[in-house]
Amino acid sequence: INPLLIKLSVPMMVSMLVQALYNVVDMLVVGKIVGKTGLAAISNASMLCFIINSLCIGLTMGGSVLVAQCKGANDQTGQRDTIGMLFFLSLVGSAVVTILGLAIYEALFQALNVPANAYQDACGYMKIICCGTVFVFGYNAVCSILKGLGDSQTPLFFVGVATVLNVVLDVLLVGPLSMGTAGAAWATITAQGVSFMGSLVYLRRYQPGFSLRKIEFHREKLLAILKVGLPTAIQMVVVNTAYLLVTGMLNQFGTPVAAASGVGLKINTFAGMHCWAIGQAITAMVGQCLGAGQIERARKVVRSGLLLNLSVTAAVAVVVQLLAEPLICMFDGTSPEVIRCGVQYLRTCCS
């Protein structure tokens, strides 16, 4: 296994895990303070968040590939143009997702049979999250650029700071200020906004020639980003939409099952996070190899990445099987039905 691949993928994996903690922290705090009703609300809302994040990660991955190729070819102009178009795409994408999300989330929750006692909380949470979509797209754009340049540690720093802030705000807004699920949503988008602004300032210093005010439209760069990123985005959205439909069917069995499936899905997502991280590391390394014309080295990176991915997946599956019940109890240790259904869901999905 290529040591450089491990060095690049580990910070990416930790960064993605920490970034995913946004919703997990919301669920932990709300589950402990509000109870299973709030937990069911965020479990359903987080499914829409998964789809938004999938679209965002998929689209920005195209920018990461192009940035890596430009770096490998030492093409500073192409690199700058790609970064500009990636931000343009992120801005347009976030605007579309925000408008569409605000227009359909209520009808979607009704179609998903969200339990009546959790419906209003789910709507309130999702409304706030939709308004902060620009921060999600913006931060992932910066992360993709830095990863394409071979820097996987800086994104980890910024997402770590944001997660700590999210935890503090969650406890404060949901607890003493009694804002419920809405407080958890405000904590999340505030932390994401801080993460985006901080990483943007860093990128401006890291790339002296880059400025949001000097972005020029380059149709060929935009199409190149979409050519790589759009199929990935569609694939990820389709997978998460399938999970959304399953959640809708499970909601018919009541609040405990809805809460359990949401928790189980979140843990299952964490268990597979290394696959995305290693995939992004492979993308960055292969992009730079192809940009430099090193075809054989690119093939070796792919083989090493596949071996690493399979090895880690096997180890994670064993751990989840052994610790399924304690993991579910972290979110709600008071409801026997939530624990039973959650453990069954988790062990089935990770088998």
For each predicted feature, which ranges?
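Short runs within selected transmembrane alpha-helices of multi-pass transporters and secretion channels
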Residues: T60, I129-K147, P155-T163, A184-M197, ...
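Interhelical loop/hinge segments that connect adjacent transmembrane helices in multipass membrane
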Residues: I1-S9, T188, M197-V239
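Residue-level signature of transmembrane alpha-helical cores of multipass secondary-active transporters
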Residues: L8-M16, F50, S90, I129, ...
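Short membrane-interface helical motifs at transmembrane helix boundaries
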Residues: V96-K127, A317-V343
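Helix-terminus/linker motif at the lipid-water interface of multi-pass membrane proteins
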Residues: L21-A40, F109-A116, L172-M179, V237-F270, ...
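Small-residue-rich hydrophobic transmembrane alpha-helices
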Residues: L39-I99, V136-P155, A260-A324
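Membrane-interface helix-loop junctions in multi-pass transport and translocation proteins
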Residues: Q153, T163-F196, A324-P326, R340
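Signature of the first transmembrane helix
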Residues: P3-S64, A68, L230-L250
